[in-house]
Amino acid sequence: MNKLKELRLKNNITLKEMAKKVGISYTYYWQIENKERNLYYYLAVKIAKIFKLKPDDIFYGW
């Protein structure tokens, strides 16, 4: 399981809820989690804020 999905599930957040929090579509977030699209830094910043992490933690582990 990838890091983003693991974080999301650990925090009991659905894919749709996460996409809404980040400000992107459900499909786009799903594609990022499944490595069909690249995770851009500006999205990593938003995701990191949700989980109270640093953006680099999203890319390199927490």
Regions found by a protein language model. Give the residues of each.
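Short alpha-helical DNA-recognition segment
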Residues: 13-31
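Key DNA-contacting residues within the recognition helix of helix-turn-helix
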Residues: 5, 30-31, 59
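Short, conserved catalytic or interaction motifs in soluble domains
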Residues: 34
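DNA major-groove recognition helix of helix-turn-helix/homeodomain DNA-binding modules
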Residues: 43-57
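The alpha-helix within a helix-turn-helix
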Residues: 8, 19, 48
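A short, Lys/Arg-rich alpha-helix, primarily the initiator
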Residues: 1-10
